[in-house]
Amino acid sequence: RVKVSFVKQPEYYAQRLASGDLAQKYISACGYDELNIIPWKGCLISSVCRFCGVNSVAVKNPNDALHAAHLRTGALGWEAARASYLGNLSESINLALQTECYSEHMHVILISGNLPDDQLDQQADIYCDIAAHIKGQVAPKCTEGIVAVITPPHDLARLYKLKQAGVAIVVFNLEVGNDPWFSKYCPGKSALGRDFFIERLKHAATVFGRGKSWTNFVLGLEPVDELLALCEKLAGYGIVSSANVLHVDEGSQLDCVPPTKETVIHFFHGLAQINLRYGFDAFYCAKALRTSLSNEFQDGRWA
């Protein structure tokens, strides 16, 4: 018999700010110790990844939530929203810092859907504003510094700007490593180009440091051995890889099923060996990501 328990909802989810907003409008928890900052809802990439349901979820959010569409060129934009957003974000983080789930530490993750392809530099600028505003506030509890999960900017100088703003690690998620599967399952990312991501991952490793340029994959969308070969190649450039096991979200457009237990074991065992050879650690800690087994395999808790 297996006992199943669920992560307790943090106290701050029910707390209101001076503005009347709920704190969970600005921050959210994942696993036991992640603090996720999702500045806007929705994704305006040219063509959505087929496994992703982010735009299905976005329509269920409060009508006054900031949406990627509000940040389109010519819209009211970030300049109009910035001051109130940053103030409410700081107040929300103050509430979160008082809760039990972050008593030991927290993994601060800045993450969102894409702005349109021609606004990726602006997206990086918005992340800079947020990171610069909160870096001192989260520093005492923030294990690895602020982690920015973002589609890479066109302008490589934005990587230096992100670092100066307080971002410690950048995550440019390929999601699928190799063609033809990359083009099939991530048509919008494919339009930007696989090399667009890989070259910026490599450059980020020189800007932020070896082991501080990350990419994630969806395990189950391509042959495992080809994916592991790419993870090994990326590790040689100082890039750390991981994966979430495929799960079918509401709104996904998939023609495949999640991988078998044997496939999951084969991949994460292989990835743990790569990380060991290159001196890398798995992302975050075992309390955080619950759709990945990187930490369990690193700690030898899989057998």
Which stretches of residues belong to each language-model region?
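Residue-level preference for long, well-ordered alpha-helices that form the structural scaffold
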Residues: W78-Y85, L89, Q123, K189-G193, ...
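Active-site mouth loops of central-metabolism enzymes
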Residues: I38-K41, T73-G87, I146-P153, G220-E222
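Auxiliary Fe-S-binding modules of radical SAM enzymes
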Residues: R1, L228-A303
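Conserved, mostly hydrophobic/aromatic
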Residues: C49, L110, F172, T215, ...
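N-terminal [4Fe-4S]-dependent radical SAM core
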Residues: R1-V48, N55-E79, A303
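Conserved alpha-helical substructure of the radical SAM core
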Residues: S56-I109
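Conserved AdoMet/S-adenosylmethionine-binding subsite of the radical SAM
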Residues: Q98-C101, G113-V257
